[in-house]
């Protein structure tokens, strides 16, 4: 960040700016453009023979990022370095129909995708052209096996899955001593998801449908992770966490934390879910449903 200092930002200087009346065209906090360009190719092969059908697919892509910042940089340094990431996917699967009622299936996949623009390619994309010195593609490995049953009145699907998320970029937030919120960009985060899923549809007669599902999951974080701390304006914070701006991104005085999350359950969504529904159609044009 040559020709710009963090303390030149209004948010880091005299706080009286907060009470200044803005005019049309005034800029606060940030004024930048984020540019993303992508190119890719995809191919898929499908094969069917009697009761067996299978497929394999793959893709390769390039994702490029750069930003142009009119707020924190002069014109000579407004455009950041262009960064590019190669990603790819490999997927395959097969289904075998044992007979008219029973089938089994399996799927495998591996994905390597470009890191996100913010927190991945750039350390703090809202305020700085500083790129991540060690960006990593996010990877996903997933495997699934399952069984299906079909009859005149009952359809059932049962499957088990195992998924590994590797080198994820995750954002966390907390409060600081001055009452502002701290934003932490975590990278290199791993997680493991596995579980069983069951769903069914029962139609014992033409006027009654019964549907249900059950999902049992075990999702947990598989690694600890390190992240640097910023305020809500995107400014790097010192270890005092009182709103004082650090001398630079990833500088010696830039606060960071090591999040001890290995073995902790992944939050944000239920890992055990169930549902049951009944639909009654006593006459043409009338339907009554109840769901739990």
Give a label for each model feature.
Residues 49-51, 60-64, 108-114, 123, ...:
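Transmembrane beta-strands of outer-membrane beta-barrel pores
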Residues 62-71, 82, 96-143, 155, ...:
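Surface-exposed extracellular loop regions of Gram-negative outer-membrane beta-barrel proteins
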Residues 1-99, 124:
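Signature of Gram-negative outer-membrane beta-barrel scaffolds
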Residues 42-44, 53-57, 91, 103-105, ...:
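Residue-level detector of the transmembrane beta-barrel scaffold of outer-membrane proteins
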Residues 48-51, 162-164, 184-292:
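Gram-negative outer-membrane beta-barrel transporters
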Residues 2-27, 76, 124-133, 172-185, ...:
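Surface-exposed loop/turn segments flanking beta-strands in extracellular/periplasmic regions
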Residues 37-43, 60, 88-92, 104, ...:
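Hydrophobic, lipid-facing positions within transmembrane beta-strands of outer-membrane proteins
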């Amino acid at each position: 960040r040559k020709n710009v200092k963090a303390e030149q930002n209004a948010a880091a200087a005299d706080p009286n700016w907060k009470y200044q009346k803005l005019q049309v065209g005034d800029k606060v906090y940030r004024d930048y453009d984020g540019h993303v360009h992508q190119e890719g190719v995809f191919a898929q092969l499908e094969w069917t023979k009697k009761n067996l059908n299978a497929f394999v697919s793959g893709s390769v892509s390039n994702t490029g990022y750069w930003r142009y910042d009119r707020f924190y940089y002069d014109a000579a340094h407004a455009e950041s370095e262009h960064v590019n990431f190669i990603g790819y996917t490999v997927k395959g699967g097969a289904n075998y129909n044992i007979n008219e009622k029973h089938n089994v299936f399996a799927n495998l996949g591996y994905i390597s995708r470009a890191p996100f623009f913010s927190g991945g390619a750039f350390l703090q994309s809202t305020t700085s052209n500083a790129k991540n010195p060690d960006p990593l593609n996010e990877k996903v490995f997933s495997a699934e096996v399952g069984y299906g049953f079909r009859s005149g009145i009952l359809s059932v699907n049962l499957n088990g899955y195992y998924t590994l998320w590797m080198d994820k970029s995750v954002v966390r937030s907390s409060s600081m001593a001055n009452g502002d919120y701290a934003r932490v960009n975590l990278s290199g985060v791993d997680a493991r998801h596995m579980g069983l899923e069951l769903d069914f549809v029962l139609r014992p007669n033409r006027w009654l449908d019964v549907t249900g599902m059950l999902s049992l999951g075990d999702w947990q974080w598989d690694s600890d992770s390190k992240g640097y701390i910023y305020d809500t304006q995107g400014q790097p914070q010192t270890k005092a966490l009182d709103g004082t701006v650090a001398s630079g991104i990833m500088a010696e005085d830039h606060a960071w934390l090591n999040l001890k999350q290995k073995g902790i359950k992944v939050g944000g969504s239920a890992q055990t879910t169930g549902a049951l529904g009944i639909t009654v159609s006593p006459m043409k044009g009338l339907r009554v449903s109840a769901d739990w």
